[in-house]
From Swiss-Prot:
Lineage: Bacteria, Pseudomonadati, Pseudomonadota, Gammaproteobacteria, Enterobacterales
Gene Ontology molecular functions: pyroglutamyl-peptidase activity
Compartments reported by the entry: Cytoplasm
CDD domains: Peptidase_C15 (cd00501)
Pfam family, one: Peptidase_C15
Organism annotation: Erwinia tasmaniensis (strain DSM 17950 / CFBP 7177 / CIP 109463 / NCPPB 4357 / Et1/99)
Gene Ontology CC terms: cytosol
Classification via InterPro entries: Peptidase_C15, Peptidase_C15-like, Peptidase_C15-like_sf, PGP-I_bact-type, PGPEP1_Cys_AS
Superkingdom per UniProt: Bacteria
Protein name (Swiss-Prot/TrEMBL): Pyrrolidone-carboxylate peptidase
Active-site residues, Swiss-Prot/TrEMBL: 80, 143, 165
GO BP terms, alphabetized: proteolysis
Record flagged with keyword Hydrolase: yes
EC number of the protein: 3.4.19.3
């Protein structure tokens, strides 16, 4: 049976919860698309997030890895296209580290691209009535750090991988006036679809998903 590893993060930046873990934890031990789901919470810390991720990949030996993170202020399921080889933290991580203009991987490529069928994910999630789009930036905080590290680690492995950013949950958005949110049940459904589509689609669709700015 195939295995799918889905990761999420602990709360950070003063939040009581992280919507990524609230959603991903509910998928643990589920069967989706004929595959067993393994959920893992990562520390929101540059120094240890990849250590935990790599150890989990080695233990689980997944066929597919989807990392999920919070993007407060975004309104939809943001399917990330690319990770860049830069850590530039606007705020300290949960361990107090705040790297500025440092590489994720010294000597590594400037960027690494998701190996998920990102256009098919957007199309499928939208078809279910859930807002989704291709995102051209995963930021320069721990989410981008994990996405870059993940894609680098999978280069010599058969597994596919990528990153999805999700909005605040409503209970978070009330503390951020004007910020969009998405219900937990909707996020969970979208992630279920992301797993199913990623397992089923080998060659991505050719659909416009770029940005003008």
């Amino acid at each position: 049976m195939k295995k799918v590893l889905i990761t999420a993060f602990e709360p950070f930046d003063g939040e009581r919860i992280n919507p990524s873990w609230e959603a991903v934890s509910r998928l643990h031990n589920r069967l989706i698309g004929g595959a067993e789901i393994v959920a893992k919470r990562l520390p929101c810390a540059f120094g240890t997030s990849l250590e935990v991720l790599y150890a989990t990949i080695d233990a689980v030996k997944p066929d597919l890895v989807i990392a999920v993170g919070q993007a407060g202020g975004r309104a939809d399921m943001s399917i990330e296209r690319v990770a860049i080889n830069v850590d530039d933290a606007r705020i300290p991580d949960n361990a107090g580290a705040q790297p500025i203009d440092e590489p994720v991987l010294s000597g590594g490529p400037a960027a690494l691209f998701s190996t998920l069928p990102i256009k098919a994910l957007v199309a499928g999630i939208r078809e279910a009535g859930i807002p989704a789009s291709v995102s051209q930036t995963a930021g320069t905080f721990v989410c981008n750090h994990v996405m870059y590290g993940l894609l680098h680690y999978l280069r010599r492995r058969k597994a596919r991988g990528g990153f999805i950013h999700i909005p605040y949950l409503p209970e978070q958005a009330i503390n951020h006036p004007g910020a969009p949110s998405m219900a937990l049940a909707t996020v969970i459904l979208a992630l279920e679809m992301a797993v199913s589509i990623s397992l089923a689609v080998e060659e991505d669709m050719r659909l416009a998903g770029g940005a003008t700015h």
